[in-house]
Amino acid sequence: METKRIHIKDYNYSLPDERIAKFPLAQRDHSKLLLYKHGEVSEDVFYNIQNHLPEGALMVFNNTKVIQARLHFRKSTGALIEVFLLEPYVPADYEQMFQTTGSCSWLCMIGNLKKWKGETLRRTFDVKGREVTLNAERREDVGKSYRVDFSWDDNTVSFAELLDSVGELPIPPYLNRETQESDKTTYQTVYSKIKGSVAAPTAGLHFTSDVLASLDNHGIDREEVTLHVGAGTFKPVKSEEIQDHEMHTEYICVHRQTLEKLIKHNACAIAVGTTSVRTLESLYYMGVKLEKNLDLSEDELHVCQWEPYEGETFEMAANVTPLKAIQNILAYLDRHSLNSLHSSTQIIIAPGYEYKIVKMLVTNFHQPQSTLLLLVSAFLHGDWHKIYDYALAHDFRFLSYGDSSLLIP
């Protein structure tokens, strides 16, 4: 299949608005679980998921945490400006960014841009009983976003504390409602740890401490990766063919322990969510790049959109097994005295893609004509219609707060 020539209209289905879950269930793990096993479709309840997994398998979770990325400023004229944080600029490191005090810069999307003529925006609010004034100054365009410089007048307050006080949690636009206080809890996974996402890795929302304990009791090995989900995850495919769609870039971090566990499991894993898929499959291509040069920079390990389909990396992949690719990354960490790999990926996974590491997938039900639906179709060798027809006919709830599926090709 010529992946680049795929027509997105071939990945459409009718999704009535009433099938989109606007709110989560009261109990996360009581969601429905669609089971696709070797072409057969059935269903169960999510809290029984361990019964459908092979004992001793490796399950990989994305431990990213959604930040309160929406900042609202009211101009003296009354105009409301929304500054939506996309990724840290100065400092560029996520961990440093959230610890920084006094000032920082982000790449942002700006709502009501035409009303922000360049003046400094200000907002005063309370942080731990102290009054703090936050200033925002718009700088240059950076691609399709803007650099915004923030400064605040209390050097004892970190940017993380500031966001917790004044920021608003971004929820998906298709929910068509305002963020509620309850979303601060329900739109985070119970294992979220590393701040940086502007959208949740929603396949993980169904897991509770009880379900995680059941996995442990079933002998499932659990490991975590970090991929900070960008706003591009909601970016619709507007081009007729996907070769004209530009994928967003997302930051990833994988620790030595996870790589060692992957090697123990012969580079085979169950991925929780499409973000874990993109991380694990990107690791393979990073390992391929390292096959002939262990002295690349972490930036040079970035996986470009079409690398798995064409060019030098694609050609080299024919001679690199998934296990060898992961071993190469571990050798790279050893060579450079690192405990974790920090890089980024722009990978697009669509029909024609050959999965390297992911053998089973836990995922929600995705929007029509989305790159996430392409990823699922690639995993099921085109059999996505069967599960979506079943889900629509059997009262499954769709999208971020909806029900789940376990896919075993």
Regions of interest found by a model, annotated:
Residues 1-409:
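Surface-exposed, charge/polar-rich loops and edge strands
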